[in-house]
């Protein structure tokens, strides 16, 4: 059975991990989902690495919602760097799914964005694991997660 890791934070203002799990359950069968929740985004890299090394996850989603302040953007960058290092150390994909609080002014629009981005990245995970040729066909299509696609040039 394929194991997939979901790692999210208590700092986030929306349950992106729950949305990703819901999407995975709707569109896959025979996978085991292991969820871990950490306080903030800087905790994601080690938690994701542990899901891979200790739980045997074949792919992991790291979901977080950095705040709007400059220090939050710095923390998001550091977390992103840590996630890249964890991927290289484990030779395993970790899909970074961040929604910055200042991407939308309206809380309802932020909620929709967070839900859509989590679900669309869950679809990416499914394609990477089970339908990699589909991603190849979509190369250069300007696809976006959470917002409208930009389209090809």
UniProtKB/Swiss-Prot annotation:
Gene3D superfamilies: Lumazine/riboflavin synthase (3.40.50.960). SUPFAM superfamilies: Lumazine synthase (SSF52121). Pathway: Cofactor biosynthesis; riboflavin biosynthesis; riboflavin from 2-hydroxy-3-oxobutyl phosphate and 5-amino-6-(D-ribitylamino)uracil: step 2/2. It holds the Pfam family DMRL_synthase. GO terms for biological process: riboflavin biosynthetic process. Keywords: Magnesium, Riboflavin biosynthesis, Transferase. One of its GO terms (cellular component) is riboflavin synthase complex. It is an enzyme of class 2 (transferase). GO terms for molecular function: riboflavin synthase activity. It catalyses: 2 6,7-dimethyl-8-(1-D-ribityl)lumazine + H(+) = 5-amino-6-(D-ribitylamino)uracil + riboflavin. Its cofactor is Mg(2+). Its EC number is 2.5.1.9. Inhibited by EDTA. Homooligomer. Belongs to the DMRL synthase family. NCBIfam families: ribC_arch (TIGR01506). This is Riboflavin synthase. It comes from Methanothermobacter thermautotrophicus (strain ATCC 29096 / DSM 1053 / JCM 10044 / NBRC 100330 / Delta H).
